A protein has these predicted regions:
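Short glycine/serine/threonine-rich phosphate/pyrophosphate-binding segments
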Residues: 1-8, 21-25, 70, 93-104, ...
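A glycine- and small-aliphatic-rich helix-loop capping segment at beta-alpha/alpha-beta transitions
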Residues: 4-15, 105-115, 134-137, 208-209, ...
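Buried hydrophobic positions in well-ordered alpha/beta secondary-structure cores of metabolic enzymes
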Residues: 5, 28, 61, 80, ...
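Short coil/turn connectors at secondary-structure junctions
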Residues: 8-11, 31-33, 55-58, 65, ...
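Small/polar-residue-rich loop-to-helix segments that shape phosphate-bearing ligand pockets
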Residues: 13-89, 107, 120-173, 177
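Active-site-adjacent helical/loop segments in soluble small-molecule enzymes
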Residues: 56, 155-212
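Glycine-rich beta-alpha junction loops
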Residues: 65, 94-98, 120-125, 143-145, ...
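A conserved regulatory-domain signal marking ACT and ACT-like small-molecule sensing domains
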Residues: 225-304
Length: 304
């Protein structure tokens, strides 16, 4: 929105939740838009935008529930068919449903045989309940690192599109998202925000559920470097490449050196060491050593 406004010489005011990633804020401002932060969710930000529009006469561009927005995002579906004409399954990260609605409409128009799968974060999955109720249902609470798809309720348009055009709505856990983000960074050399890797997360979690050839739509790179580091570390722990150990050893010179020597001999890379001499769980004459290790995988971690 900010870039389009800049290219057209128009003014743009963008509303975001207070939890929006810093890179997203900075990039939006760099394109010349005014940014207002308000609330904890996209729903809160949308309500603030609508109040602003009512007071100023500005036009609201809905983040997902508008025919033009859905049509624009549908061009992704056209690109999928151009680049992978033999595709059998398209998997799309989904929040409010604008992207999957557009992709499904475009793909179905040309290839009605292609299976369309929407993927939501399991702690912010607004579509299952809404589809069951036959109307948008507001989630009572959301808690996910995937802020870009943390939407409390779908729109009327997107719910209708998903009901009529999407074959399945799947959910992924925070662990799945962490693993997928690590995979994208390490294997695909892509920096993607947690919301953008939801489709990849679904594929990695249950690859046999998707008929190949499969296209996973990777959408969104707005991630704070600090969060990226945390998620990558969490992902490494989830796949058995980070190992934390608490050891009780005799309180005498050389004990810590002996522990570290054993770990080095086992081929583990020591990332962090903490040494505690006092504590209710310690016996007299012993200390606790806490170590964080990098291993080559779950088998190596078990050996260590």
């Amino acid at each position: 929105v900010a870039l389009a406004a800049q290219l057209l010489g128009a003014s743009a005011t963008v509303f975001m939740p207070e939890t929006a990633p810093l890179p997203k804020l900075e990039a939006t401002r760099a394109y010349g838009a005014t940014v207002h932060l308000g609330g904890q969710t996209l729903t809160d930000a949308l309500a603030a935008a609508q109040e602003h529009a009512a007071a100023t006469g500005a036009v609201v561009i809905h983040p997902f529930d508008h025919a033009d927005v859905i049509a624009g995002q549908g061009t992704v579906g056209l690109e999928v068919l151009e680049q992978c004409p033999d595709v059998r399954t398209v998997v799309v990260c989904t929040g409010g449903g604008g992207l999957v609605s557009g992709v499904a409409a475009a793909v179905r128009a040309r290839r009605p045989d292609v299976r369309i799968v929407a993927v939501q974060a399991e702690t912010a999955a607004c579509f299952p309940g809404s589809l069951e109720a036959g109307k948008p249902v507001q989630l009572a609470a959301m808690a996910t690192m995937a802020d870009g798809i943390a939407v409390a309720a779908p729109g009327d348009l997107t719910l209708a599109h998903v009901r009529d055009l999407v074959d399945e709505v799947r959910t992924v856990s925070e662990e799945d998202l962490s693993r997928a983000l690590l995979f994208c960074v390490e294997r695909a050399k892509l920096v993607v925000e947690p919301a953008g890797v939801a489709a990849v997360a679904a594929l990695l979690a249950e690859p046999e559920a998707f008929e190949p050839p499969v296209v996973a739509v990777v959408s969104g790179g707005n991630i704070d470097p600090v969060l990226l580091l945390k998620v990558v570390q969490h992902g490494m722990a989830a796949v058995g490449r980070y190992l934390s150990l608490r050891l009780h050893v005799p309180d005498r010179p050389g004990s810590l050196a002996g522990v570290l020597a054993e770990l080095a001999a086992a081929g583990a890379n020591v990332l962090e060491v903490a040494h505690e001499r006092t504590g209710a769980r310690l016996h007299l004459g012993e200390v606790e050593v806490f170590v964080v290790l990098e291993t080559r995988g779950p088998d190596h971690a078990a050996e260590v």
